[in-house]
Amino acid sequence: MNYIEEKVNRARSVLRELTSLKTSVKNETLLKVAELIDKNRDYIKEENRKDVEKAKEMGLRPAVVDRLVLNDKRIDGMVKVLKDVASLPDPVGEIIKMWNLPNGLKVGRMRVPLGVIFIVYESRPNVTIEASSLCMKSSNAVILRGGKEAINSNKALVNLIKEACRETGFPEDAVQFIDRSEREIVWEILKMEGKIDVAIPRGGESLIRAVVEHAKVPVIKHYKGVCNIYVDDEADLEKAYHIVYNAKVQRPSVCNAVENLVINRKILKEFFPKMAYYLGKAGVELRCDEESLQVIKENPKLSFVNAKPATEEDYYEEFLDLILAVKVVDDVDEAIAFIEKYGSKHSDAIITENYTKAMKFLREVDSAAVYVNASTRFTDGNEFGLGAEMGISTDKIHARGPMALEELTIPKFVILGEGQVRDNFGVPEEWMKEF
């Protein structure tokens, strides 16, 4: 048996045990992991230091190095995630719905685990804890393959998870870690139909496309977050200033940050100068269509704003930076058409006080999360009250939006009967009398 087969077979070997595991054991294990992480901060930070130093030697970008770092604040965050997941209701075995048929059968849907989940992710070691905790609580086995730049940090965290499992009786084979860096291992696992139930990539668009290209197993994903905010002519502009500013400036490098600002032409000259001023003060570069760029050029107070003409490609771009593309439209219909063409079906918002337009936007914008008068930055499992998340899905099969506990289960039909047979087609009565 080779390295990959052993890892996958170990994960599959505990699926039945996981399904029948008591919620109390799952919660106890998660809390034990939290305790061990809290107690072993020095060990975690020492292993993490090796990764950070190696990353700097390799010349990785500062943003990548920053995502690698595990300081006390981020360790506190991992401890909180574990405690939060432990406090959430256990979805496994929940009967979602039950109904009675005329023949007396009771038909229902029960939540059951997906099975073996393969997580492929990049530089953030926090994902090791987020993914493991969600899979453990939802009775899934997980195979973790983090980026090679975080291998020591991830190993340390998995060691603590397995130590907790041994102490509480949770099957430790439910958490498998790929501690080799060859890409070929990832491609081989992605082809293991029947053994891997689903793959979930977390990272940049190039990683996700590579996973989809090589996979023969189902993949739950989103390629990128080109989020849009439309400011309607009936918007409360005070709300709009704060919403747009938050969605772009608070944390520009995440997938739920806004990338395109769409403005109704009727309010362009009233709304955009102030908005451009606030964004410019925050260091945001604006890529404007002709009309919005002219507004900036005509206003001497905006001479400091870094604004340039937008290209067609800009509206498709996930900048993940302090850059915002701007487009002027006639009405809500044109705004929706723009979002349909350039957006990525992640998160989009309308700012308006008009109920009819708001409902039209909610119905017609085909995205995983659609907002009225709120920032797109809320698209997140914790912010939605779901607890930690495995990532955001923009797929239309199985799950859409934040992938939290319930999204790591699937419904199966359960049928309760009292001897019913279809069309009364049972053993003939005379045969019953003969023997």
From Swiss-Prot:
GO molecular function: glutamate-5-semialdehyde dehydrogenase activity; NADP binding
Cellular component GO terms, alphabetical: cytoplasm
Biological or metabolic pathway of the protein: Amino-acid biosynthesis; L-proline biosynthesis; L-glutamate 5-semialdehyde from L-glutamate: step 2/2
Enzymatic reactions: L-glutamate 5-semialdehyde + phosphate + NADP(+) = L-glutamyl 5-phosphate + NADPH + H(+)
The enzyme's E.C. designation: 1.2.1.41
Top-level division of the source organism's lineage: Bacteria
Keywords noted in UniProt: Amino-acid biosynthesis, Cytoplasm, NADP, Oxidoreductase, Proline biosynthesis
Keyword Membrane tagged: no
Top-level class of the enzyme under EC nomenclature: oxidoreductase
Keyword hit for Metal-binding: no
Entry's localization field: Cytoplasm
GO biological process: L-proline biosynthetic process
Pfam families: Aldedh
InterPro entries reported in the protein's UniProt record: Ald_DH/histidinol_DH (IPR016161), Ald_DH_C (IPR016163), Ald_DH_N (IPR016162), Aldehyde_DH_dom (IPR015590), G-glutamylP_reductase_CS (IPR020593), Glu-5-SA_DH (IPR012134), GPR_dom (IPR000965)
PANTHER family noted in UniProt: DELTA-1-PYRROLINE-5-CARBOXYLATE SYNTHASE (PTHR11063:SF8), GLUTAMATE SEMIALDEHYDE DEHYDROGENASE (PTHR11063)
Role this protein plays: Catalyzes the NADPH-dependent reduction of L-glutamate 5-phosphate into L-glutamate 5-semialdehyde and phosphate. The product spontaneously undergoes cyclization to form 1-pyrroline-5-carboxylate.
Family indicated by similarity: Belongs to the gamma-glutamyl phosphate reductase family.
Record's protein name: Gamma-glutamyl phosphate reductase
Natural source organism: Aquifex aeolicus (strain VF5)
Gene this chain is encoded by: proA
